[in-house]
């Protein structure tokens, strides 16, 4: 399978929605339609501190992977940080280098933006993804705690 990684475009909406639905299903998550709409708008707005990349099958032109990143300030560096918030590969394209290519494209963009670090979280049970992540980054050993606003 041949594919290319590129920036998300407005005409990608149907393919992006399909991948996004697969990502939410994978994590057994539900999202309000308004949140999906705002997320889509933010990903395409150049004034937002975020970006999205997609992997496109070179033959069918179907989207087979996505990654969303947020660029933000931190307290441990004067340079911005790149938070890789979402990464998903279509089931039909897994174990073909799509995830790795998306991460490498994020690294390249973060380097262009002079980010001090690129980082992300994954669920501890996501063993398949963790095998890849262990090859392309180091596990910082932190445990995430959170409180959702009531």
Place the predicted regions along the sequence by residue:
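Acetyl-CoA-dependent GNAT
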Residues: 3, 7-13, 18-79, 85, ...
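Acidic/polar helix N-cap motif
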Residues: 9-12, 90, 126
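Charged catalytic carboxylate motif
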Residues: 15, 35, 101-102, 128
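Residue-level recognition of the GNAT/N-acetyltransferase active site
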Residues: 72, 85, 90, 94, ...
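Conserved acetyl-CoA pyrophosphate-binding loop and the N-cap/start of the following alpha-helix
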Residues: 93, 97-105
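Conserved active-site alpha-helix within GNAT-family acetyltransferase domains
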Residues: 100, 124-143, 147
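Conserved GNAT acetyl-CoA-binding A-motif
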Residues: 111-122
């Amino acid at each position: 399978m041949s594919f290319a990684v590129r920036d998300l475009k407005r005409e990608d909406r149907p393919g992006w929605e399909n991948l996004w639905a697969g990502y939410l299903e994978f994590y057994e998550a539900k999202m309000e339609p308004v949140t999906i709409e705002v997320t889509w708008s933010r990903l395409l707005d150049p004034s937002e501190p975020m970006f999205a990349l997609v992997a496109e099958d070179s033959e069918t032109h179907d989207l087979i992977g996505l990654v969303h990143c947020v660029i933000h300030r931190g307290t441990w560096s004067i340079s911005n940080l790149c938070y890789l918030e979402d990464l998903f590969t279509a089931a039909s394209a897994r174990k073909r280098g799509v995830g790795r290519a998306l991460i490498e494209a994020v690294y390249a963009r973060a380097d262009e933006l002079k980010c001090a670090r690129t980082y992300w979280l994954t669920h501890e049970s996501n063993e398949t993804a963790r095998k890849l992540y262990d090859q392309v980054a180091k596990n910082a050993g932190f445990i995430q705690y959170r409180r959702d606003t009531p």
